[in-house]
C-alpha cells in the first residue's frame, strides 16, 4: 500500500537520504587512511584481522546511528548466531546496495568478492584490499582465493545473483558458489534479506528518497552441504530462494482480486 507523503515529509526524507549517504561516504573515505596508519607495521594475518574487525565496528556504529534516528528499523540479530562458524560460505539475496554492509556489520571475519575496479580505487578500495577482499577479475582467481580464505577460517560472502535484484524478483543464479563449494567442501549457509522498501535496489536512483524509516530484517535459512554436481546444486539453491522469498498466497489472491475488480465496468 502506498503511503501518502506531504511536501514537508518529502523534504525531510531527502535531507535524511543526503546525510545518510554523506556519512557513509566520509566514513569510507577517511577510514582507509586511518586503518592504513594503524596497521602499517602489523604482520599480514594480524593486519587483515584487525582491519576486518574495524570495518565491522564502523558499519555497526553507522547502522546503530541510523536506527537511533529512525532512518532504518533493523533486525539483524540472527546473524550473530554465525559468529565463530569458521570456513562457512554465506549466500544472500541482493535487494539493495546496503546488503553486504548489513551482514559485515555483524560478522567480523567475512571476506567479500568485490568489483576489481572498486578495489583499485585509491579512495574507497584500499581498506577493502587490506581486509583481503577478493577482486572479481577472473573465475580462477576467485575460486583459488576463496578456497584459501575458507581454509584459513574466514567466512565467504557471496550474492549468487551477481547483481542487485528488482523488488519481488530473484535473478538467475551464477555458478560461482557451486564451484567454490565443490572445491572446498564447505557448507553453504543461506541468508534472506527482507525489506518493506525497494530503496537502493536495481533501478532505484540515488537521489530518490524513500519513505523513512525503511524496515529491514535479515534471517537465516537452511544450511546446504555441497554436492558433486555444481549445476544441480545451483538449481536447488535458486529454487529454495524463490520458495522462501515468494509472496504469501493470500497477497497474490488479493492482487488478483484487485485486478479483476478494476477490470469490471
Segments predicted by a language model, with ranges:
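Membrane-anchoring hydrophobic helices of lipid-metabolizing enzymes
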Residues: 1-88
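Non-catalytic C-terminal accessory region of glycerolipid acyltransferases
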Residues: 3-7, 142-265
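Catalytic core of membrane glycerolipid acyltransferases/transacylases, capturing the structured
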Residues: 32-57, 69, 84-138
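Short gly/ser/thr-rich secondary-structure transition/capping motifs
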Residues: 69-77, 136-140, 200-203
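Thr-Gly-centered strand-to-loop micro-motif
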Residues: 77, 114-115, 137, 160, ...
Amino acid at each position: 500500500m502506498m503511503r501518502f507523503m506531504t511536501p514537508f515529509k518529502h523534504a525531510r526524507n531527502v535531507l535524511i537520504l543526503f546525510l545518510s549517504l554523506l556519512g557513509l561516504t566520509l566514513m569510507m573515505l577517511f577510514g582507509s587512511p586511518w586503518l592504513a596508519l594503524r596497521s602499517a607495521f602489523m604482520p599480514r594475518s594480524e593486519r587483515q584481522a584487525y582491519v576486518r574487525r574495524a570495518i565491522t565496528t564502523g558499519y555497526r556504529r553507522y547502522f546503530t546511528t541510523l536506527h537511533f534516528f529512525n532512518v532504518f528499523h533493523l533486525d539483524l540479530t540472527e546473524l550473530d548466531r554465525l559468529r565463530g562458524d569458521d570456513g562457512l560460505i554465506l549466500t544472500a539475496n541482493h535487494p539493495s546496495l546496503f546488503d553486504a554492509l548489513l551482514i559485515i556489520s555483524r560478522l567480523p571475519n567475512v571476506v567479500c568478492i568485490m568489483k576489481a575496479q572498486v578495489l583499485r580505487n585509491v579512495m574507497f578500495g584500499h581498506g577493502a584490499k587490506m581486509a583481503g577482499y577478493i577482486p572479481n577479475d577472473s573465475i580462477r582467481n576467485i575460486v583459488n582465493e576463496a578456497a584459501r580464505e575458507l581454509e584459513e577460517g574466514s567466512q565467504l560472502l557471496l550474492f549468487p545473483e551477481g547483481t542487485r535484484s528488482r523488488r519481488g524478483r530473484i535473478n538467475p543464479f551464477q555458478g560461482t558458489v557451486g564451484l567454490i563449494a565443490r572445491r572446498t567442501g564447505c557448507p553453504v549457509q543461506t541468508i534472506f534479506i527482507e525489506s518493506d522498501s525497494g530503496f537502493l535496489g536495481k533501478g532505484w536512483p540515488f537521489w530518490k528518497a524513500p519513505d523513512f524509516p525503511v524496515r529491514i530484517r535479515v534471517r537465516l535459512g537452511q544450511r546446504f552441504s555441497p554436492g558433486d554436481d555444481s549445476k544441480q546444486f545451483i538449481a536447488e539453491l535458486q529454487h529454495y530462494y524463490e520458495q522462501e522469498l515468494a509472496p504469501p498466497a493470500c497477497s497474490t489472491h488479493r492482487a488478483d482480486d484487485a485486478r479483476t475488480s478494476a477490470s469490471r465496468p
